[in-house]
Amino acid sequence: MFKLIEKNTWKRKPYFDHYFGQIRCTYSITVNIDISVVMSFKNKNRTKLYPLLIYVLTKAVNNHEEFRTAINDKGELGVWDTLLPCYTVFHEENETFSNIWTVWNDDLMTFLSNYERDMEMFGGNYGIDAKPDTPANTFPVSSLPWTTFTGFNLNIFADGSYLLPIFTLSLIHI
């Protein structure tokens, strides 16, 4: 569900107007995070790392209204109650990737089950959207697991109204 923001009473209005209207710009930040707890869980439970990281990112995004603030297809400012991850899946056979989205569930094991089901059903599909009907309340997660980087900047060439976070993961050194 997308809840409209009443801009005139919104506490962030002056900041939004300043950065969205006066000095239009984009932001990019690269953060190194400690995933030792995630790795411990992965090894103990024999799960895959990528879906665990997608879960952690989605949980963080859904815990912060600022990350769920968006402009809908009607040009209205609002907040999604929940965002779903839309992540890339690499196809080694032809060196392309596809997007798959997964229904969010705060319970880790349920989310991992949803992820595995989506991978079984859509992971072998080629083309940009392996799973059809991507909902509007998704945010992108991708991975470049063959390279390490300490900075990454993705510029969306559009009208500048895309506000949701975009995550790109690199090779992980343990």
Indicate where each model-derived feature is located:
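Short amphipathic alpha-helices and their capping loops
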Residues: 1-22, 79-84
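Helical lid/core segments from catalytic subdomains that handle acyl or acyl-like groups
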Residues: 24, 91-151
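Short amphipathic alpha-helix starts
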Residues: 25-39
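Acyl activation and transfer enzymes in specialized metabolism, enriched
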Residues: 38-63
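Amphipathic alpha-helical interaction segments
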Residues: 60, 64-68, 122
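Small-residue-rich loop/turn and linker elements
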Residues: 67-100
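Glycine-rich active-site loop/lid that clamps phosphate-bearing ligands
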Residues: 143-166
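Conserved small/polar residues in nucleotide/adenosyl-binding loops
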Residues: 172-174
